[in-house]
């Protein structure tokens, strides 16, 4: 049995559970994996990126039992001192991470209509983990809480007041755990004091969002009440004129639910290219001269640059533009194209720095002469969740020093 405490981080999706085990002293990852096919006929568990192993068809508790078995095989099960759960939506009830209690569970349930697929999955994971680890303190970390510092003028829609007052219709933002982690690392990398800083962070993956961070606090973000607003993404449309959607509905007799599905699952890079939602596929097609792949990438880049520029207006100063997420960390092409469109800020990209692989880790990619610095910082949401669990669980470690 290991002689040191570990933190188990759990991220329950609608059909999967991603998990990581981190050393509570250093927050280094000791084990990670994913259970897929929750509540499906075929379920699998893969560890550390290895080959998936078939599991008996099972729900969240069965999948967590399989994960617990994997921990036991590695003498980690008895070392689990804290469990951190990623929860997609905290509404306006949760402004920070919290220790899970019955009241917290009830409040999560209360706001779950805002993100039914993800929140109810998280609630199932929490209930299962509580049964499997009854003596372990558990913490909820919300994807929306970092953005609860937005001012009303930044989170309100231009809709009748009653929709906000009676239904809670407003902008909440997402990717908050990633934006919070990356903004902290950016301050260290750029040598900036938190209370005198202005950053724009571009979290670019299959889901993508921009966040303006002023003096360590989120002051604007591109996603809204749902993750559909903002940037064009892998399969999501991003910002679309509602009038255009109403016109399409009238012409095609599609329902609101039909169009929501189209905007979420058949649009974005996939919709324009007609080829793929995977940027790696589209980049290959770009180099092969595929016209619609090139158009999809150009549209993607245009939206990113426009949102970065717009979010800079929420800052009192612009110290850095930071790329993160799977695309932001790995795509030399996207970073170059976005940076070219931000020349108005005096941003100059260093070609050699930009071409460094992500294995280099945190790195500056702007030229020395650039008026605004630009960096790549690999996100680590699991580490951020573990740090929150450690802080709330009052385990004093070197990772918090």
From Swiss-Prot:
<dbReference type="Pfam" id="PF00871">
    <property type="entry name" value="Acetate_kinase"/>
</dbReference>
<dbReference type="GO" id="GO:0008776">
    <property type="term" value="F:acetate kinase activity"/>
</dbReference>
<keyword id="KW-0479">Metal-binding</keyword>
<comment type="similarity">
    <text>Belongs to the acetokinase family. TdcD subfamily.</text>
</comment>
<feature type="site" description="Transition state stabilizer">
    <location>
        <position position="175"/>
    </location>
</feature>
<dbReference type="GO" id="GO:0005829">
    <property type="term" value="C:cytosol"/>
</dbReference>
<comment type="function">
    <text>Catalyzes the conversion of propionyl phosphate and ADP to propionate and ATP.</text>
</comment>
<protein>
    <recommendedName>
        <fullName>Propionate kinase</fullName>
        <ecNumber>2.7.2.15</ecNumber>
    </recommendedName>
</protein>
<feature type="binding site">
    <location>
        <begin position="326"/>
        <end position="330"/>
    </location>
    <ligand>
        <name>ATP</name>
    </ligand>
</feature>
<dbReference type="GO" id="GO:0008980">
    <property type="term" value="F:propionate kinase activity"/>
</dbReference>
<comment type="pathway">
    <text>Amino-acid degradation; L-threonine degradation via propanoate pathway; propanoate from L-threonine: step 4/4.</text>
</comment>
<feature type="binding site">
    <location>
        <position position="18"/>
    </location>
    <ligand>
        <name>ATP</name>
    </ligand>
</feature>
<keyword id="KW-0460">Magnesium</keyword>
<keyword id="KW-0547">Nucleotide-binding</keyword>
<comment type="subunit">
    <text>Homodimer.</text>
</comment>
<dbReference type="GO" id="GO:0005524">
    <property type="term" value="F:ATP binding"/>
</dbReference>
<feature type="binding site">
    <location>
        <position position="86"/>
    </location>
    <ligand>
        <name>substrate</name>
    </ligand>
</feature>
<feature type="binding site">
    <location>
        <begin position="203"/>
        <end position="207"/>
    </location>
    <ligand>
        <name>ATP</name>
    </ligand>
</feature>
<keyword id="KW-0808">Transferase</keyword>
<feature type="active site" description="Proton donor/acceptor">
    <location>
        <position position="143"/>
    </location>
</feature>
<feature type="binding site">
    <location>
        <position position="11"/>
    </location>
    <ligand>
        <name>ATP</name>
    </ligand>
</feature>
<feature type="binding site">
    <location>
        <position position="11"/>
    </location>
    <ligand>
        <name>Mg(2+)</name>
    </ligand>
</feature>
<keyword id="KW-0067">ATP-binding</keyword>
<feature type="binding site">
    <location>
        <position position="175"/>
    </location>
    <ligand>
        <name>ATP</name>
    </ligand>
</feature>
<dbReference type="InterPro" id="IPR023865">
    <property type="entry name" value="Aliphatic_acid_kinase_CS"/>
</dbReference>
<keyword id="KW-0418">Kinase</keyword>
<dbReference type="GO" id="GO:0046872">
    <property type="term" value="F:metal ion binding"/>
</dbReference>
<dbReference type="InterPro" id="IPR004372">
    <property type="entry name" value="Ac/propionate_kinase"/>
</dbReference>
<dbReference type="GO" id="GO:0006083">
    <property type="term" value="P:acetate metabolic process"/>
</dbReference>
<feature type="site" description="Transition state stabilizer">
    <location>
        <position position="236"/>
    </location>
</feature>
<dbReference type="GO" id="GO:0070689">
    <property type="term" value="P:L-threonine catabolic process to propionate"/>
</dbReference>
<dbReference type="InterPro" id="IPR000890">
    <property type="entry name" value="Aliphatic_acid_kin_short-chain"/>
</dbReference>
<feature type="binding site">
    <location>
        <begin position="278"/>
        <end position="280"/>
    </location>
    <ligand>
        <name>ATP</name>
    </ligand>
</feature>
<dbReference type="InterPro" id="IPR024917">
    <property type="entry name" value="Propionate_kinase"/>
</dbReference>
<dbReference type="InterPro" id="IPR043129">
    <property type="entry name" value="ATPase_NBD"/>
</dbReference>
């Amino acid at each position: 049995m290991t002689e040191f405490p570990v933190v188990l981080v759990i991220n329950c999706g609608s059909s999967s559970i991603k998990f990581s085990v981190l050393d509570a002293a250093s927050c280094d990852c000791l084990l990670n994996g994913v259970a897929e096919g929750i509540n499906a006929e075929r379920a699998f568990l893969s560890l550390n990126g290895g080959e998936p192993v078939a599991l008996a068809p099972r729900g969240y508790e069965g999948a967590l039992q399989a994960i617990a078995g994997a921990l036991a095989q590695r003498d980690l099960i008895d070392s689990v001192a804290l469990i951190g759960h990623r929860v997609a939506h905290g509404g306006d009830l949760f402004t920070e991470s919290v220790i899970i209690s019955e009241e917290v569970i009830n409040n999560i349930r209360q706001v779950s209509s805002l993100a039914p697929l993800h929140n109810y999955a998280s609630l199932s994971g929490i209930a299962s983990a509580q049964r499997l680890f009854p003596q372990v303190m558990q913490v909820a970390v919300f994807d929306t809480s970092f953005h609860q510092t937005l001012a009303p003028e930044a989170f309100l829609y231009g809709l009748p007041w009653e929709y906000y007052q009676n239904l809670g219709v407003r902008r909440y933002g997402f990717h908050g755990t990633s934006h919070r982690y990356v903004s902290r690392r950016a301050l260290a990398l750029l040598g900036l004091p938190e209370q005198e800083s202005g950053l724009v962070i571009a979290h670019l993956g299959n889901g993508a969002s921009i966040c303006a961070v002023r003096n360590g606090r989120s002051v604007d973000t591109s996603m809204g009440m749902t993750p559909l607003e903002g940037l064009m993404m892998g399969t999501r449309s991003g910002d679309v004129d509602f009038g255009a959607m109403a016109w399409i509905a009238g012409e095609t007799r599609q329902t609101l639910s039909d169009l929501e599905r189209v905007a979420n699952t058949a649009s974005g890079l996939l919709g324009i290219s007609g080829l793929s939602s995977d940027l790696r596929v589209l980049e290959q097609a770009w180099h092969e001269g595929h016209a619609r792949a090139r158009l999809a990438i150009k549209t993607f880049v245009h939206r990113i640059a426009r949102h970065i520029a717009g979010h800079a207006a929420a800052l009192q100063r612009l110290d850095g533009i930071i790329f993160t997420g799977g695309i932001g960390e790995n795509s030399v092409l996207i970073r170059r194209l976005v940076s070219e469109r931000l020349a108005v800020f005096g941003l100059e990209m260093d070609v050699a720095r930009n071409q460094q692989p992500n294995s280099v880790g945190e790195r500056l990619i702007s030229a020395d002469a650039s008026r605004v610095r630009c960096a790549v910082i690999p996100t680590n949401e699991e580490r951020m969740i573990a740090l929150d669990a450690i802080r709330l669980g009052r385990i004093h470690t070197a990772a918090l020093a």
